[in-house]
Amino acid sequence: MESSASTSASTSTADVVVIGGGPGGYVAAIRAAQLGLSTVCVEMDKTLGGTCVNVGCIPSKALLSSSEHFEFAKHAAAAHGIGIGQLSLDLSTMLKRKDDVVAQNTKGIEFLFRKHKITWAKGFGTLKPGNVVEVTTGGGGGAGGPPAQKIATYQAKNVIIATGSVPIQLPFLKFDERRILSNVGALTIPQVPKHLIVIGGGIIGLELGSVWSRLGAKVTVIELLPAILPGMDDDVVREADRILRKQGLEIRIGTRVTNGGLTDTGVFVEVDKAGATERIEGDHVLVSVGRKPATSGIDVAALGLNVGKRGEILVDDRMRTNLPNVYAIGDCVPGPMLAHKASDEGVVAAEVIAGKPSRMHYKSIPGVVYTWPEIASVGLTERQVKESGREYRTGRFPFSANGRARSMGDAVGFVKMVADARTDELLGVHMLGPNVSELIAEIVLAFEYRGSSEDIGVTVHAHPTLSEVTKEAALATLGRSLHI
């Protein structure tokens, strides 16, 4: 496809204008530019990378890693013959390291934009009828901010909406990012709190709760549902709950938060469990009850854009909306709000625009929880398979029977497989254990090719490695596990 870009006195044209520079948007822009399309990416933040790189995936993993080192030094180093002496924590250095990691990543994205000659339009993008994108200062002049000033206007041959998501607030706990925190504020607490209250026992709540727990905070996790980690396999949830409690997290399930606010020294929440009410006070409260699509620059009614009940933009497996030459990707479309999903959707959108036969495969998107031990999964849970009426069999193998896990001192958790009883096709794989975020990739590849447990079981895995647990779980599914 021939690239074309021109500029008039008031309007520039481009083959592709991407609204949003997060993991979906910036990847879409890079792929579009690789395919020879003149590309503009509109991003209002000072740095590219969106929530994931700036205040999500990357900084949280930096803190998780630092806190795991601290935990090792405090509790496990002696068993390896390593004497630490008097252990101390320099939180300001830890937070600076986190910021440095983020800066390295954002600067890397800027370099890639320069390399591929992508125009970064620094401002707030608004999609107008006819695929016109206006770029203004600030957040579009809303929410009591200064009036928006137009920076640029683009006539786009194709538009990719990649506006991401925002955390959901509770009506009585509005984010101030000092005491009442979203994921953003939870990454910058200036000193280890004595008591951190976490509302929501999902991925964000447990990951960030684990960080501050390891660093010395009392952490209380309050979950409305009967179990933490909604949507995960029941066996994984039970074991994760047990391990996290053993690590020191106070987990309250089946508990509703009915009220909350600030005190003179911190915060309070009021909770109700089966009619019994209680007031809990702490230094900070992290509200992690989910996220919602962010589409403030997209007037869906005026545009005639089809959206779902949560405001998510409806698309097909080629990321096409109901409007001609308008695509949408990432957290603002249906499906799990995952950075890797957004990135792959960005690639698909760019390739479809370029005329390639690309489409998304939603069946094989992995999910990871970066607690310790880690949790990873792909496909259906055993409960989902059972409820479908499909005949199946399962196999399970523990890390406690794996030589590498024992040599590392991290022999907890297991790998569990669910396979079709007749065809042996893998239907779901669920992992809890050391470094399973890396082990799940093998299974995702098998899912792409509708692989079987036997495909995994007959594949030679290096010894001694953690990946042997995956092989043994596959063999267990076939009834012939070797080491248990």
Where in this protein do the model-derived segments appear?
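N-terminal Rossmann-fold NAD(P) dinucleotide-binding loop
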Residues: G25, G205-L206
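Gly/Ala-rich phosphate-binding loop of Rossmann-like dinucleotide-binding domains
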Residues: A29, A33, G209, S213-R214
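Short hydrophobic core segments
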Residues: V17-I19, G125, T153-G164, V198-I199, ...
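Flexible, glycine-rich terminal cap/loop adjacent to redox cofactors
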Residues: I19-G24, A28, A33-D45, T51, ...
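Glycine-rich flavin
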Residues: E2-T7, T11-A14, I30-V192, T220, ...
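Beta1/beta-strand and adjacent pyrophosphate-binding region of the FAD-binding site
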Residues: S10-G22, V192-G202
